[in-house]
């Protein structure tokens, strides 16, 4: 069985350094952070938060999950992410998405929400050039320039990995064209399997070698002693975050249950083709997460190994 890496998302804009050190100490492979300019509640900025985390850690990989790509000037984003990769000694992974579920932030930033897909595609093409080439000229629909070299260049070669997030076919095509990995959210294992088949076909259609393409999955988790409590917390937390009723669908998209339940559910889910990276988001405050995570002994973690697979919550 191929190796699966696990990550955990920052749960708050506060205490970033402390949480990052905890995640690294517990052995997570990735620390991730999402962002919005504005949403239904306080939301971080991934590049700023991960910069703080970079200074507090040494080994854990740092992933934006996601950068809200169409709201950025792509030249500035290329610069900021290159510097973050250098500052973290080559640990940055750029997860990208196009947003659109909160149109007010597009209006506030002066970006037409209907252009978010085309802007993102152009930005990805441009950013890869600026990361890897010198004296770059670019003639796009939204950005034009000539003779630009960004220094320092990223540490990782050929460039920091690009993970494309989304749920629908345009995002799959974007991943197949520009991405190094696929990072959907609110997906079942079956949905992941179907999407990867499409992405592979789209990539081959575009003439890409897809053998190194990495499938991932952003999973919401809720771990409590009582399974019913875990389900209720999951529905309540997601409902608050997304201003929707999750009471009927939390069970479809959330890994919830007791510390004893969840490993078994993971073992079933690991039959899906998730052979590179999984990102988890825990709807627990940092202190509760620390208590739950540290209570799961090293022996219990080792018992979950199947080949190179390690399932953590």
Model feature map: region roles:
Residues 1-10, 100-104, 143-159, 227-251:
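N-terminal small/glycine-rich loop or linker at the start of catalytic domains
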Residues 124-127, 192-199, 285-304:
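C-terminal helical cap(s) of enzyme catalytic domains, especially alpha/beta-barrels
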Residues 1-57, 61, 157-160, 282, ...:
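N-terminal beta1-alpha1-beta2 module of alpha/beta enzyme domains
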Residues 12-23, 80, 166-174, 258-268:
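Short, acidic/polar
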Residues 4-14, 67-74, 159-167, 248-260:
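Active-site mouth loops of central-metabolism enzymes
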Residues 6-8, 31-33, 62-64, 92-96, ...:
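Hydrophobic faces of well-ordered beta-strands that scaffold small-molecule active sites
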Residues 2-11, 70-137, 185-186, 190-194:
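Flexible, glycine-rich active-site loops centered on histidine and acidic residues
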Residues 27, 53, 84, 127, ...:
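Conserved, mostly hydrophobic/aromatic
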């Amino acid at each position: 069985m191929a190796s699966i890496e696990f990550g955990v998302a920052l749960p708050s804009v506060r205490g970033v350094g402390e949480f990052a050190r905890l995640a690294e100490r517990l052995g997570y492979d990735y620390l991730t952070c999402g962002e919005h300019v504005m949403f239904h509640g306080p939301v971080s900025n991934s590049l700023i938060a991960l910069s703080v985390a970079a200074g507090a850690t040494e080994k854990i990989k740092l992933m934006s999950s996601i950068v809200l790509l169409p709201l950025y000037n792509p030249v500035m984003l290329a610069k900021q992410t290159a510097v973050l990769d250098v500052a973290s000694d080559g640990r940055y992974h750029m997860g990208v998405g196009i947003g659109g579920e909160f149109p007010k932030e597009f209006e506030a930033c002066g970006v037409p929400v209907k252009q978010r897909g085309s802007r993102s595609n152009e930005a990805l093409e441009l950013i890869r050039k600026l990361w890897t080439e010198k004296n770059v000229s670019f003639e796009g629909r939204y950005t034009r320039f000539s003779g630009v070299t960004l220094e320092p260049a990223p540490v990782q070669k050929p460039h920091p990995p690009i993970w494309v997030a989304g749920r629908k076919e345009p995002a799959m095509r974007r991943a197949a064209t520009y991405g190094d990995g696929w990072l959907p959210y609110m997906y079942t294992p079956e949905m992941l399997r179907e999407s990867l088949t499409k992405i592979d076909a789209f990539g081959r259609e575009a003439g890409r070698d897809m053998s190194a393409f990495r499938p991932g999955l952003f999973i919401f988790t809720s771990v409590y002693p009582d399974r019913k409590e875990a389900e209720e917390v999951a529905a309540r937390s997601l409902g608050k975050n997304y201003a929707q009723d999750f009471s009927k669908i939390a069970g479809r998209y959330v890994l919830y249950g007791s510390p004893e339940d969840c490993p078994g559910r993971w073992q079933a889910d690991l039959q899906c083709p998730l052979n590179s990276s999984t990102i988890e988001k825990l709807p627990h405050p940092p202190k509760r997460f620390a208590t739950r995570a540290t209570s799961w002994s090293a022996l219990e973690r080792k018992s979950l190994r199947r080949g190179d697979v390690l399932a953590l919550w």
